[in-house]
Amino acid sequence: MRNVRLFRALLGVDKRTVIEDIEFEEDDAGDGARVIARVRPRSAVLRRCGRCGRKASWYDRGAGLRQWRSLDWGTVEVFLEAEAPRVNCPTHGPTVVAVPWARHHAGHTYAFDDTVAWLAVACSKTAVCELMRIAWRTVGAIVARVWADTEKRIDRFANLRRIGIDEISYKRHHRYLTVVVDHDSGRLVWAAPGHDKATLGLFFDALGAERAAQITHVSADAADWIADVVTERCPDAIQCADPFHVVAWATEALDVERRRAWNDARAIARTEPKWGRGRPGKNAAPRPGRERARRLKGARYALWKNPEDLTERQSAKLAWIAKTDPRLYRAYLLKESLRHVFSVKGEEGKQALDRWISWAQRCRIPVFVELAARIKRHRVAIDAALDHGLSQGLIESTNTKIRLLTRIAFGFRSPQALIALAMLTLAGHRPTLPGRHNHPQISQ
């Protein structure tokens, strides 16, 4: 066939593919056209298992002729057409034969898959589907195939020393992913559906005992299910509790105390006389309980925010709380003091934490007394975070990016496609466009 090199380049195939014929088909209406290239593998790559690439004996003709979608030529769709017999693999049994232009179980060529994967990482959902003329679910399947191929060529657990572990909700009804990041490279290392001991155990199974022993630091949110697995699988690693989550415990305790004060004010308001319709008269009885409940309800953000971030109005609310409710203001000071502990860090931070625990135990606020006991239970991990300066900041930023990908990936059939998209985007192995690299080859 003439111009073989030209057609190989246009079709995105290599010398292992024989191009027998190329036809141009146009429908009667004239509003659609297709190019069909009839191809076959060279004898050197014939009769190989599509799953493992090993040579195998002939089994049957399979489903006969098959077509694989290739990249468009301008506005014309292009397909590769070839026989798809089956071989009898010693490992996998009857399996469709491997072809050098496409992945196993794929309806698209390497070039098409790689282009779609690059677009899925770099473009919007609408742009990918409109440009490539495929459904979004098809994009999910392609992304999963490309990541599976990429994963075989890389060692994502190489030089893993300091890791962060967290969970993220990816779907309603409490559907979670467990994610692991590398603190040194800043990359996503591993993700899987679920957030329990069994799920995290899968990570350490994939990592292996030898590499697990090389992990020196693990940061987490002090969840028991993470701490238990880490203690069992890499007992020599230093576990660090995330400072943000510890301060969040104090913020939650402060909000419990605010709601208590608000409910007390509402109870007083229920005993106060009710006003009739319209503007109250000059001689109407005051209702301080109702006014106090209203102001406490609106004070949540003034209590939550850092002092340097308060607006003028929120600062006024905080000053009002300090004057009218010493107990609630004391709870606020406890929260801010705990935040200060993690801003100083090191030995000074540990001494400040000792003083904070002593104060919280004597503060006569039950929720903060309980918080002091909780912090004492996790004291070793908190001290490690103060000593080594390790936090979940990196993994929280990764989670934010995964949440964005979750919205993009809406419509994928399974979480595996979402995980594949996240790995291609955040694991440091982003796909490249065909022609910019050597695409994966079947072993010979």
From Swiss-Prot:
Species of provenance: Mycobacterium tuberculosis (strain ATCC 25618 / H37Rv)
Swiss-Prot/TrEMBL keywords: DNA recombination, DNA-binding, Transposable element, Transposition
Gene Ontology, cellular component aspect: peptidoglycan-based cell wall; plasma membrane
Region (Disordered): 273-292
Name used for this protein in its record: Transposase for insertion sequence element IS1557
NCBIfam families (UniProt xref): transpos_ISL3
Example GO molecular function: DNA binding
Pfam families: DDE_Tnp_ISL3, HTH_Tnp_ISL3, Zn_ribbon_ISL3
Family (UniProt): Belongs to the transposase 12 family.
GO biological process: DNA recombination; transposition
PANTHER family, alphabetized: TRANSPOSASE FOR INSERTION SEQUENCE ELEMENT IS1557 (PTHR33498:SF1)
